[in-house]
Amino acid sequence: MIPLAIKIGITGPVGSIKSEALQKIIDMLKNDNLNVQGVLVSKVTNNGKLTGYTIEDIESKRKAQFCFDNFVSRVKIDKLGVDTKILEEILIPSLQKARETADVIVIDEIGKLENTTKKVHAEIEETLKCGKPLIVTLHKRSRNPVLQEIKSLEGVRVFDITPINKNILPFKVMHVLKGEE
């Protein structure tokens, strides 16, 4: 059983090591028969060029591209247009259900998502304040105030992932989640 209110932040450079570590943590939690819910964000590339992002509901596996290089929108992530309707259709019900039924909630790339729409911002804020164990990832150099907000939450631990510690970090996070550290 994981103590309530434990919040884990994983920061690191742009690249896949945060996602790889997060997926390993999710797999370890599921192997412990814990209900993990929330959202994962993945890059979409074409010939090595970033062309968008997808969002996936961890529990239902519902996945859609919400960010495109050729999509006209006032809302941007990394200069890519955001289809806020698609983002809200997956993120909002996923986080609402996670707050009700998950043992552990995950929000991947929280800094990118936080300021896309007022509804998304409100859902993320509500989820950050809920008493459930939470794991979030964000870019290390994010100037987004969400990093400071996460650091100020009660029971939070922030881990900086590097190529050197990427293999042991999931085990360290699991020890913290289980109250062993």
From Swiss-Prot:
It is an enzyme of class 3 (hydrolase). Transmembrane segments: none annotated. InterPro entries: Nuc-triphosphatase_THEP1, P-loop_NTPase. Signal peptide: none annotated. ATP binds at residues 12-19, 104-111. Its EC number is 3.6.1.15. GO terms for molecular function: ATP binding; ribonucleoside triphosphate phosphatase activity. Pfam families: NTPase_1 (PF03266). It catalyses: a ribonucleoside 5'-triphosphate + H2O = a ribonucleoside 5'-diphosphate + phosphate + H(+). Keywords: ATP-binding, Hydrolase, Nucleotide-binding. It comes from the Archaea. The keyword Hydrolase applies. Belongs to the THEP1 NTPase family. Has nucleotide phosphatase activity towards ATP, GTP, CTP, TTP and UTP. May hydrolyze nucleoside diphosphates with lower efficiency. This is Nucleoside-triphosphatase THEP1. It comes from Thermoplasma acidophilum (strain ATCC 25905 / DSM 1728 / JCM 9062 / NBRC 15155 / AMRC-C165).
